[in-house]
Regions:
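Class II aminoacyl-tRNA synthetase catalytic cores and aaRS-like
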Residues: 1-593
Length: 593
């Protein structure tokens, strides 16, 4: 192997063009592949910007040509030469009009044969890719999202700074508090028996910053949650966090619509239309069966309860007698595609989300096949068809339940399943909206008490202030989520800045005065010295980048992601530690068999 000597990079591989033809330049990187054509050698040199073809021929110095003959994939080199127009141009790479005729070559590092080919068109086991993540990240399809993620972060920083925000880091070792997911705990060596928690979000500290007079704060923060992994979750993730004083929810939404507009324009050259639609939570659940509705397609849910008032169809009658509801969707024109077998599968989807079953009617040219219509009167059939604008070729799908949210949620998932399987979603659309007016509380059967739907510091709607303790289920929050194509991209709320109201919230959530002070005493004390009205929100950066780049998983936009068991295959984390480390921390392990 050689050193770089006096050679230093003058150009990046992916940034040269015909405008540079005739120039002497020095480039460096890894050999993507080399081809010896007998008397002429071609090699594709890859760096972080792209690929440039190198050429070695009869005019190349003999010692350089000899080195070129030894080149193999992933050898790391630096070379100097003259850029020329390429005779056989290609549009497969951005630099397909030019090639570099090499006059000087230094091989800086050799490479073993890789366990898989480093090109985009491969079918490789995910475990192998993650074990050799440093190789996987060399592939352009994996490398580019990480580079674009960096650019996105820079745009975010620039935007916030232009709008008078101050970037402030909050602590990573903090006090563990209730009302969230499970904390990652860090034992203190100097205070035996005491533990820090890794932050699930900077929530308390950013509110304290508003009480500290900073007015507008942002941070690209690392956050940690010890929860089971799903396709869109990681135990450690990056959050774009913000907070503002002396604002309303309208001000916060306007600032964030500006951020989205800037990002989509600079990164994707797409003009996003603002302001976004604002949809109350009740409407989102009622029309789409989701608090993060995908509005790129129809199949909206409709309330057909009135159609069946007085019905003798026993399943519906029992639900209505108990004060329940009947909801439906019309899968228009899909009767030929939704067979009985397909509908049975949709029924399983509905049951997975709490429905007791899925009633259906297929309206075909050969007649109607239905699981319930024979029990209906002609008037009920006519009213149902009119309510759903039903005609030949349609499929009507109904769910009944005493809980309208459960009925809509089940149909919402059926709606998504149909759309995904039958090509109803335009992948090129970016449909943004705000979901607003969330419930302030949700009841936990497991805990046997009311829980904060967002967190205990969320401001109730003004008209609900008197109900916080007397009727928690009727209260709504000054809270808002930004939704893109059926995915919650971020969310936030206005915060409570009245100590007396905060005490009432803690009481409604079942906190004793002692427990509230133990967990949040420092925030409650800060309120005593004057607290401006404030609010904010946060985005999951990983999810935002995934949506912008149309990736299937957030793992594709994270350099070193965790897997399903929260492990990191490349390094082997988490790992056991030696006995002395545990002794220093005053920790003894008890392992279950």
């Amino acid at each position: 192997m050689e050193t770089m000597g006096t050679l230093r990079r003058t150009n990046y591989c992916g940034e040269v063009s015909l405008a540079n033809a005739g120039q002497e330049m020095t480039v460096c990187g890894s050999i993507a592949r080399a081809r010896d054509k007998g008397g002429i050698i071609f090699a594709d040199l890859r760096d972080t910007t792209g690929i440039l073809q190198l050429v070695f021929d009869e005019d190349t110095p003999k010692d350089v040509f000899a080195k070129a003959e030894s080149l193999k994939s992933e050898y790391v080199v630096i070379c100097r030469g003259k850029l020329r127009e390429r005779a056989a141009k290609t549009d497969k790479i951005a630099t397909g009009d030019v090639e570099l005729y090499v006059s000087e070559l230094r091989i800086l590092s050799e490479a073993q044969t890789t366990p898989f080919e480093l090109r985009d068109e491969i079918n490789v086991n995910d475990d192998l890719r993650l074990r050799y993540r440093y190789l996987d990240l060399r592939r352009p399809s994996m490398h580019e999202p990480i580079v674009l993620r960096s650019k996105i972060m820079q745009i975010i920083r620039n935007y916030f700074c232009e709008n008078h925000f101050c970037e402030i880091e909050t602590p990573t070792l903090i006090k563990s508090t209730p009302e969230g997911a499970r904390d990652y705990l860090v034992p203190s060596r100097v205070q035996p028996g005491h533990f820090y928690a890794l932050p699930q979000s900077p929530q308390l500290y950013k509110q304290i910053l508003m009480l500290s007079g900073f007015d507008r704060y942002f941070q690209i923060a690392r956050c940690f949650r010890d929860e089971d992994l799903r396709a869109d979750r990681q135990p450690e993730f990056t959050q774009v966090d913000e907070e503002m004083s002396f604002v309303s929810e309208d001000d916060i939404m306007t600032i964030n619509e500006g951020l989205i507009k800037r990002l989509w324009k600079e990164m994707l050259n797409i003009d996003v239309q603002t302001p976004f639609v604002r949809m109350p939570w009740d409407e989102a659940m009622g029309r789409f069966g989701s608090d993060k509705p995908d509005t790129r397609f129809g199949l909206e849910i409709q309330d057909v309860t009135e159609v069946f008032k007085g019905t003798e169809f026993k399943p519906f009658a029992a639900v209505l007698e108990a004060g329940g509801t009947i909801r439906a969707i019309n899968a228009k024109g899909l009767a030929d595609k939704l067979s009985r077998k397909n509908i049975d599968k949709l029924g399983e989807v509905a049951k997975t989300y709490g429905a007791k079953g899925l009633a259906y009617s297929r309206l075909t040219a050969d007649g109607t096949s239905s699981s319930f219509e024979k029990f209906l009167t002609d008037a009920e059939k006519t009213a149902l068809y009119a309510a759903l604008n039903a005609e030949t070729g349609d499929v009507l799908l109904l769910v009944s339940d005493t809980d309208w949210v459960k009925a809509c949620t089940a149909l919402g998932q059926v709606r998504l399943d149909i759309a995904r399987k039958h090509g109803l979603i335009d992948p090129d659309k970016f449909n943004f909206l705000w979901v607003v007016d969330f419930p302030l509380f949700e009841y936990s059967e497991q805990e046997g008490r009311w829980m904060a739907m967002h967190h205990p510091f969320t401001l109730p709607k003004a008209e609900d202030l008197d109900k916080v303790e007397s009727d928690p289920g009727a209260c709504h929050a000054v809270a808002y989520d930004i939704v893109l194509n059926g995915v919650e991209m971020g969310g936030g709320s206005m915060r409570i800045n009245d100590p007396a109201l905060q005490d009432r919230m803690f009481h409604a959530l079942g906190f004793t005065e002692e427990k509230a002070r133990e967990s949040f005493g420092f925030l409650m004390d800060a309120y005593k010295f004057g607290a401006p009205p404030h609010g904010g929100m946060a985005y999951g950066l990983d999810r935002m980048v995934m949506l912008m780049l149309k990736k299937d998983s957030i793992r594709d936009v994270i350099a070193f992601p965790k897997v399903q068991n929260a492990g990191e295959p490349m390094s082997g984390a988490p790992d056991v530690v030696d006995a002395q480390q545990l002794k220093d921390l005053n920790i003894a392990l008890t392992m279950k068999d």
